[in-house]
Amino acid sequence: MSSRENPSGICKSIPKLISSFVDTFVDYSVSGIFLPQDPSSQNEILQTRFEKPERLVAIGDLHGDLEKSREAFKIAGLIDSSDRWTGGSTMVVQVGDVLDRGGEELKILYFLEKLKREAERAGGKILTMNGNHEIMNIEGDFRYVTKKGLEEFQIWADWYCLGNKMKTLCSGLDKPKDPYEGIPMSFPRMRADCFEGIRARIAALRPDGPIAKRFLTKNQTVAVVGDSVFVHGGLLAEHIEYGLERINEEVRGWINGFKGGRYAPAYCRGGNSVVWLRKFSEEMAHKCDCAALEHALSTIPGVKRMIMGHTIQDAGINGVCNDKAIRIDVGMSKGCADGLPEVLEIRRDSGVRIVTSNPLYKENLYSHVAPDSKTGLGLLVPVPKQVEVKA
């Protein structure tokens, strides 16, 4: 029977269509991106291990700076001037810390989600990870939030609540959940002009919050890609013994609000946790615990290097412990060190190299700042011509 012969079938679908339209309207108002809801992804198993791709690109901490985030993707040839995916079958791992220190955190989350979908259609893949700042924000720890960051979430909350009001006008839809349920109207020892931004941020990012559930539940906390293991801070043997898949699923369950309450699992909290560890990312190589690193790597079959963010490397992307630890946080966000974007590239046929936007390399690869004489960087890039420079 056709829809013309059975108009009731069309009528029954109208509430869902209206709900979808409202969600898309809210998304565009917040981010400038049309991003249809993708409910099926919420039920997918969070994959931990991946085969080595032909081309793998690793990107460090982004911290609320959309302009620098775009630049990092552009120098790697992953997007065009209209932010469309051009990376083909490339696999990308972004090691976390999208949140805090900048005012475009939500825009980056939408930007990454859009690119994930475009990459999948082209045969590529983008993995996003949880950093310590994602964990902190889900817990309600906003020490590193900026004024613009509060404003961005307040704008989101205004649109989100407007969307909910629009849905209540449509019979046939369940009453939307109040995102502010249980959140106090004010906070002691806090400026009154911050109240609404803080409330909006709690509403969005707490366990089972709309933004946490939609975006952050898709994040890995640990990922093994070919012969590399990715983590925001670092992995110790005890974390690996606990189980990498187990860590990913438990953190995801906590973000979804299934268990654990306000605070993250213990292995995500404290100085020796997977998102806070700095044993392998200290800028001074002699301070890195290479023995602990080698022990950890030896417990993951087939893995020969650990790639991490978390600690800003003033010298740029570099390796220590015979390149078994590669540190890729270059502090690119203007809220951090305003560093020049760099990304790590691993090709199956030609190994590891650094792609940088640093104009000094472009001017004279054999100058005093050539990579073979740059502290730390030379450990990864033995000869200058292995550095690719993009404007």
Curated annotation (Swiss-Prot):
Disruption phenotype: No visible phenotype under normal growth conditions. Its cofactor is Mn(2+). The active site is at 133 (proton donor). CDD domains: MPP_Shelphs (cd07425). Mn(2+) 1 binds at residues 61, 63, 97. Its EC number is 3.1.-.-. Induction: By infection with the bacterial pathogen P.syringae. The keyword Hydrolase applies. The keyword Iron does not apply. It holds the Pfam family Metallophos. SUPFAM superfamilies: Metallo-dependent phosphatases. It is found in: Cytoplasm, Cytosol. Mn(2+) 2 binds at residues 97, 132, 232, 295. Keywords: Cytoplasm, Hydrolase, Manganese, Metal-binding, Protein phosphatase. One of its GO terms (cellular component) is cytosol. Belongs to the metallophosphoesterase superfamily. SLP family. PANTHER family: SHEWANELLA-LIKE PROTEIN PHOSPHATASE 2. This is Shewanella-like protein phosphatase 2. The lineage of its organism: Eukaryota, Viridiplantae, Streptophyta, Embryophyta, Tracheophyta.
